[in-house]
Amino acid sequence: MRARGISVIVVVACAVAAAAVWAVTEPRAAFSKDDPALDQEGDPAKGRLVFAAGDCASCHARPGQPDRLRLGGGLALSSPFGTFRPPNISTDRIDGIGSWQTRDLANALLSGVSPTGTHYYPSFPYSSYAKMTVADVRDLMAFLRTLPAVAGKAPPHIPTLLFSIRRFVGFWKLLYFQRQPIIADPGRGDSWNRGQYLVEALGHCAECHSSRNVFGGIKPKTRFAGGKDPEGVGYFPNITPARIGDWTASDIAELLKTGNTPSHGRVGSSMTDVVTNTAMLPQEDRDAIAAYIKSLPTRPTPQP
């Protein structure tokens, strides 16, 4: 009888633990079906700039063709956690997001939650996009709706064992994800505050220019100090004064427009795509990004 009692206790404890795990990893969407914050129509002209600042085409454009606005997805993003494929976000109603409402895009960007209520993998940088304004989400959706439909779904993700159960992405979110809008600093000017938003939210610069731990979370002490390319083909540079302290704000803004560095070099690898996008922004936005980057605290480059 005693052994049976212990068995019952173990079973109950396991059931309680499983229920707790299920509860804490539950996907939580920020916006409900009738949320009034998403009622207003967006501006596609403004959305085009959000699209450029967010570097959306670099991941979601269909590989192997020149049109960056054919958003069929499928680019292979290799990492220590598997190979991930950005999805089709074209207006195709079957294979893309043509049937989405604005709230679906808002929940994807600001919560990392799909319309079917599942977690997105953090290869989609929603930990940065979560700082976006709702107005920018509305404008982005308005622009996306002007783009052509592209048939065909992206190939499936191939995650490693750590992320093979998508529900467990909820644990990752508990550690590394927080929906926290950018707070303007009243002691700084409008340009600096605009730059903070572009760098920290839309541009998601820290997602590449930082080092990560074994679970894929950014190490706070390396934020913007550079990090290994997860595809294993290089190293993203330190963009704090420790590495580019002798660059002027004009140097940074020029790089974002032309890809040229002060030492007469040029950016390479994935940064070429970034420059393609930042070159589309108004000059005041590039100046704002430069002003914010110039203010970053000095951090030593971590060892590879």
What is the role of each PLM region?
Residues M1-G42:
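N-terminal export/targeting leaders of redox proteins
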Residues V16-E26, Q101-P115, S128-A154, S250-P262, ...:
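C-terminal capping alpha-helices of c-type cytochrome domains
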Residues P27-A52, F171-E200:
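Electrostatic cytochrome c docking/interface patches
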Residues D39-A76:
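Short extracytoplasmic
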Residues G47, A53-P63, L105, L140, ...:
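The canonical Cys-X-X-Cys-His
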Residues C59-Q65, L110-S111, P125, R145-T146, ...:
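Detector for the c-type heme attachment site
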Residues L75-D104, S127-A135, T222-S263, V274-D287:
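Electron-transfer interface patches adjacent to heme c in soluble/periplasmic c-type cytochromes
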Residues G152-G170:
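Extended, well-folded interaction surfaces typified by the phenylalanyl-tRNA synthetase beta subunit core
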